[in-house]
Amino acid sequence: MRLNKFIAETGFCSRRKADELINEGRVTVNKHEAIIGMDVKPEDVVKIDGERVKLNTKYEYYILNKPKRVICSNEDKFGRRLAVDFIKSRARLFTYGRLDFMTEGLIIISNDGEVYNHVMHPRKKLYKSYIAKVSREIEDKDIEALQHGVVIDGKRTAPAKVKKIDKKELRIAIFEGRNRQIRKMLETLGYNVNSLKRIKVGELTLGNLQVGEYRTLNEDEIKYLKSL
């Protein structure tokens, strides 16, 4: 098994992050510094920053309805609440498909490092759906603009799927994952975003979860996630 895949399957981090750690010289195999692309066996001793990592025997998969003012990270120097803190588990958990500090809604949390490749890798083009409430009435020309792509940070966005729900509310689905993308898309068109909530990732939905609640994925959802 490739070392980066081994590290991902321990739940420590994604394959991409594992390669970064290897390049930084923070990974050893049997007391020797690791190199990119090397293979390891289950009995090999793999350490990151001097701490051994082992393959998980059981993976856990959750969906959290993230509240506002919660961080999608495993640490925060300002002491703000973390999304993983909502989950009652002893496993080392990570969030996949980040939401910014003021956005609420569906976030996937797991100790399976391979989730990154299923959900977040750019080549997947997995649509994520949001409900946005804005400061003024939404004009039809702006819906068309979103559907064709708008320029943010000097680069045009991919076409979005957009449906007007009410005068100041719309549903928008995108497959890109640029920083604060939907907020920036709407701000570029002159709208202030009053609230933003993610309701769907691919075919995974919040269901009846209230803000701050979570649930485990069922078998069909896990199979779907791994099929992506």
Regions found by a protein language model. Give the residues of each.
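Basic, flexible Lys/Arg- and Gly-enriched helix-loop patches that mediate nucleic-acid binding at interfaces
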Residues: M1-L228
